[in-house]
Amino acid sequence: MLPLCLTFLSFFLSLGGSFKAVMTKEEADGTTEAAACLFWIFNWTVTLIPLNSLVALAISSPTFFGDRPKGPIFGAKAAEAPTSPPTALRYKYLTSLGSNFGGIFVYPLFLLSTF
C-alpha cells in the first residue's frame, strides 16, 4: 500500500482526467468548464441558443398578405446571402458543496468494509 502522501499526489496528478470523466459534457449544446477547490466544485456552462424571432410580426404585415406598399421602400436592392438566426448566450453557474477527495478515501473505506 502506498503512503498517504503518494496517494494524495497521484490523485492530484490524475485530477484532470478523472474529474472530466465524472462530468457529463454537452458538447453539442455548449461549453462546460469546471474547477474544484477543496470542498467546493464550480461548474460554468455557456450555451448558444436562438432568440425568439419576429416571424409572427413579419407574417402579419400587409406585404405578406399581398398589399402593395405605398411610399419608398427602404429594403435591400440586391438579394442578400442567408444568415444564421439571431442567437444569445445563456450562462449557468453551479456551485456545489462536496468533496473532491473521493479517489483518496474510497480505497481505505473498502478495506474497512471487508473486515
From Swiss-Prot:
So which residues are the signal peptide here?
1-24
The protein's UniProt keywords, in alphabetical order, are: Membrane, Signal, Transmembrane, Transmembrane helix
Name of the protein in its database record: Putative uncharacterized membrane protein YEL053W-A
Entry membrane topology: Multi-pass membrane protein
GO cellular-component term (any): membrane
Q: Which residues cross the membrane?
A: 39-59, 93-113
Chief localization: membrane
The record's subcellular location field reads: Membrane
Q: What is the phylogenetic placement of the source species in the record?
A: Eukaryota, Fungi, Dikarya, Ascomycota, Saccharomycotina
Relay the record's extra comment.
Partially overlaps RPL12A.
